[in-house]
């Protein structure tokens, strides 16, 4: 499944998006060329989170795109999502793999730590994420990753690399050229007035990869 980690990785954060617009926003991102979606909700509202994730899973299936759940392997398993993304304080790769199975996508936040990424690959991660790369309102943490780190990671890792933090259509190409397989975007996509056009602007940097297409029913 790691082969699907490429192109525009759209992170639908409910802290940023009005909940009534969540499904429509994700559909527009997929229409514009997003390759996969992450559902990110840090609340403890179990029922609402289940309903939202289940709805996004149906939308993602329509566009044949994987859905990744942030920091909740159990929710991912309950709705049949393709995988989970884990941060520094989340559950382990081993426990997530036991819950989701061998075919699930498991991604790991590595911030600016190459050693963490190497350990994640050895533990069975399907992709690693570095960032933030540039100033970002939605990723204000004082942790910086550099393009040099991406280049070094590309030399040392044999799995997809996701870059995140302040990535725009204008600076995305240098991130890709440094070694990123995918660019993860939150505000640059979902705070745009035209989400579909914004997604297409990112997607143009990955011309050899086809746009997701709706299934025919």
Curated annotation (Swiss-Prot):
Task: Respond yes or no to whether keyword Membrane is given for this record.
Answer: no
Q: How is the cofactor bound?
A: Binds 1 Mg(2+) ion per subunit.
Keywords, ordered alphabetically: Magnesium, Metal-binding, Thiamine biosynthesis, Transferase
Provide the binding site for 2-[(2R,5Z)-2-carboxy-4-methylthiazol-5(2H)-ylidene]ethyl phosphate.
136-138, 166
Q: In which pathway does it act?
A: Cofactor biosynthesis; thiamine diphosphate biosynthesis; thiamine phosphate from 4-amino-2-methyl-5-diphosphomethylpyrimidine and 4-methyl-5-(2-phosphoethyl)-thiazole: step 1/1
Span of the signal peptide:
none
Per its UniProt record, what SUPFAM superfamilies does this chain match? Thiamin phosphate synthase
Question: Per its UniProt record, what HAMAP family does this chain match?
Answer: TMP_synthase
Protein name listed in UniProt: Thiamine-phosphate synthase
Q: Identify the coding gene.
A: thiE
